[in-house]
Amino acid sequence: MSVQSSGVLLAPSKNLSPEVGRRCANFHPSIWGDHFLSYASEFTNTDDHLKQHVQQLKEEVRKMLMAADDDSAQKLLLIDAIQRLGVAYHFESEIDEVLKHMFDGSVVSAEEDVYTASLRFRLLRQQGYHVSCDLFNNFKDNEGNFKESLSSDVRGMLSLYEATHFRVHGEDILDEALAFTTTHLQSATKHSSNPLAEQVVHALKQPIRKGLPRLEARHYFSVYQADDSHNKALLKLAKLDFNLLQKLHQKELSDISAWWKDLDFAHKLPFARDRVVECYFWILGVYFEPQFFFARRILTKVIAMTSIIDDIYDVYGTLEELELFTEAVERWDISAIDQLPEYMRVCYQALLYVYSEIEEEMAKEGRSYRLYYAKEAMKNQVRAYYEEAKWLQVQQIPTMEEYMPVALVTSAYSMLATTSFVGMGDAVTKESFDWIFSKPKIVRASAIVCRLMDDMVFHKFEQKRGHVASAVECYMKQHGASEQETPNEFPQPVREAWKDINEECLIPTAVPMPILMRVLNLARVIDVIYKNEDGYTHFGAVLKDFVTSMLIDPVPI
C-alpha cells in the first residue's frame, strides 16, 4: 500500500520524551533562513533573449570545435577550455568525436612537450580512453628519474600534475609523477611573482579530477579571462550559460525550501541537522545539467530525509524506538505509523510522501519498476543504521573487518547512487539498477572515499557526543595505534579507491558513462566538502562561499 502524496503532516511533537536519557549533538541551526524562498519567480523575457544569445554562441563554438584542423594541440586547448568553463554538456558528441579521432590515430611524438602530452593524456582518460602512461617515460633521464629541467616549466608541471589524478592500479610512473610535480609545484607557490602561482595553489588543493565541474568553472572564469589568448565567444557563452543555469537552480531550491519549511523539522525535530540548502548543493554536484531537474528534486529530498533519519539513529532515538522505526521502514506502509513514537511519525510520514511523489512521476513515464530499487536501497540504509545503533548500545568497538561493510552502507553512497538513477530518463534501464545492486567496484570505492574522509575529520566531535565508533577508533583498538598516527593510515586507502573509480571509467565500461558519472560526482562532492572538515555538519566559511558562488552571486558579464 502506497501513501497518497496529498494530505496534512502530523502535528508537531508535543513531547520529545525528555525523561529518557538521550544524547545531544547541539548542531547549529541553518544559516540561510528563508533566503532561497525569494527565488520563486519564473524566467523573464530578458532571460529568453539571453537564451537566444546562448544558442548563437553555441553554434559559433561548435563550428570552431568541428572545423577541419590538423593542429591537434589547438583542439586540445579548445576542448580543455570548454570543459573547464562548464559548458561541455552542450558539446558532448562533438568532443567525443574529436577525441576518438585523436585516440584512434594518435602517435605520441618524443618531441611533444610535457604540457601538451599531459593535456592529451588527461583529456583522453577523462573521456574513457585507455591511453598508455608509457609516454611519460619520454620525460625521464637515463637513470629513470623525471628530468630536473622540467621543474622550471611550471605550466608543464601543472599539466602533468593534473594528469596523474587519472591513474589506475599498476601505473607506478604516475605515482612517481605525482610526487615529483607536487614537490616542485609547492616550491613554485613560494614565488608570488610566478603568474601561475594562484592556479598552482588551487590545483594542489583541488585537482580537476576531484573537483565539482560547476564549482571549478566558477573559479576558472577569471583564470581564462586573464589569458590574452582566450576565446571571447566561448567565455561569453560560459558566463551567460552559468547565470541562466543559476536562475534555474535558484528556482529549484526555492521550491525545495518551501517543501522543507512546510515540514517544519527545525521545530518538530530540533535535535536534527537543518541542512536542506547544503543538501541541494550536494546534489547539484551530482548533476547540474538542466535536463536533470526532476532527478535533482527527488534526490535532494531523499538526502534531506536521510540526514534526518541519520540523526534519529545517531543522536536521539533509543534502541527500542529505533527497532520500531526499522520495522516500519521494512513494512513501508502508512499503517505502521501507529507503532511509532510521536516524533518518529513526522519523519516516517514525510519519508513515505517523498517516495510517493517518485512513484507518481515514474508511473506517468511507465518506469514504475524503479521505485522498487529506490525503496530497497533505503531499507538497506536503515538496517545498517540500526546495526550501528546496536554497537553503540553495548559500547562495542568492532574490528575494521566488522566495521567497514556496515559503515560503507551508512555512508549512504550506495543508496544515493541508486536513487540518482531514478530520475535520469532514458539514460537508465532496469539493467542499470541490477548492476548497482551487484555492488560494483566503483560504488564501493566511492563509499570508501566518503566513509574514510568523513571519519578522519569528524571522529573527535562524534566521540564527545557519544557516537558509534568510527574507523579511527576501530583501527586504534585493533592495531594498538595512537590517535595521532591513526588518521595517517587512511589517505592511502582513499587514493586506492580513486584508482578503482578511474579504472571503472575506462572503456569498455560496465554501464554507460552517464551512469558512472553520477558515482564519480558523488565521490567528488565528498572530496570538496570533507577535505579538511565536515563542511556539512559544521557549516564553515568555505562551504558558505561555495554555496554563495554557485547559488547566489551571478557571474559578472
UniProtKB/Swiss-Prot annotation:
<dbReference type="InterPro" id="IPR008949">
    <property type="entry name" value="Isoprenoid_synthase_dom_sf"/>
</dbReference>
<dbReference type="InterPro" id="IPR008930">
    <property type="entry name" value="Terpenoid_cyclase/PrenylTrfase"/>
</dbReference>
<dbReference type="Pfam" id="PF03936">
    <property type="entry name" value="Terpene_synth_C"/>
</dbReference>
<keyword id="KW-0456">Lyase</keyword>
<dbReference type="InterPro" id="IPR001906">
    <property type="entry name" value="Terpene_synth_N"/>
</dbReference>
<feature type="binding site">
    <location>
        <position position="314"/>
    </location>
    <ligand>
        <name>Mg(2+) 2</name>
    </ligand>
</feature>
<dbReference type="GO" id="GO:0000287">
    <property type="term" value="F:magnesium ion binding"/>
</dbReference>
<protein>
    <recommendedName>
        <fullName>(-)-germacrene D synthase</fullName>
        <ecNumber>4.2.3.22</ecNumber>
        <ecNumber>4.2.3.75</ecNumber>
    </recommendedName>
</protein>
<dbReference type="InterPro" id="IPR034741">
    <property type="entry name" value="Terpene_cyclase-like_1_C"/>
</dbReference>
<dbReference type="GO" id="GO:0005737">
    <property type="term" value="C:cytoplasm"/>
</dbReference>
<comment type="function">
    <text>Involved in the biosynthesis of germacrene D. Can use farnesyl diphosphate as substrate, but not geranyl diphosphate or geranylgeranyl diphosphate. Produces mainly (-)-germacrene D along with gamma-cadinene.</text>
</comment>
<dbReference type="InterPro" id="IPR044814">
    <property type="entry name" value="Terpene_cyclase_plant_C1"/>
</dbReference>
<feature type="binding site">
    <location>
        <position position="310"/>
    </location>
    <ligand>
        <name>Mg(2+) 1</name>
    </ligand>
</feature>
<dbReference type="InterPro" id="IPR050148">
    <property type="entry name" value="Terpene_synthase-like"/>
</dbReference>
<comment type="similarity">
    <text>Belongs to the terpene synthase family. Tpsa subfamily.</text>
</comment>
<keyword id="KW-0963">Cytoplasm</keyword>
<dbReference type="InterPro" id="IPR005630">
    <property type="entry name" value="Terpene_synthase_metal-bd"/>
</dbReference>
<dbReference type="InterPro" id="IPR036965">
    <property type="entry name" value="Terpene_synth_N_sf"/>
</dbReference>
<comment type="pathway">
    <text>Secondary metabolite biosynthesis; terpenoid biosynthesis.</text>
</comment>
<dbReference type="Pfam" id="PF01397">
    <property type="entry name" value="Terpene_synth"/>
</dbReference>
<feature type="binding site">
    <location>
        <position position="462"/>
    </location>
    <ligand>
        <name>Mg(2+) 3</name>
    </ligand>
</feature>
<feature type="binding site">
    <location>
        <position position="310"/>
    </location>
    <ligand>
        <name>Mg(2+) 2</name>
    </ligand>
</feature>
<dbReference type="GO" id="GO:0016102">
    <property type="term" value="P:diterpenoid biosynthetic process"/>
</dbReference>
<keyword id="KW-0460">Magnesium</keyword>
<feature type="short sequence motif" description="DDXXD motif">
    <location>
        <begin position="310"/>
        <end position="314"/>
    </location>
</feature>
<dbReference type="GO" id="GO:0052577">
    <property type="term" value="F:germacrene-D synthase activity"/>
</dbReference>
<feature type="binding site">
    <location>
        <position position="314"/>
    </location>
    <ligand>
        <name>Mg(2+) 1</name>
    </ligand>
</feature>
<keyword id="KW-0479">Metal-binding</keyword>
<dbReference type="GO" id="GO:0034004">
    <property type="term" value="F:germacradienol synthase activity"/>
</dbReference>
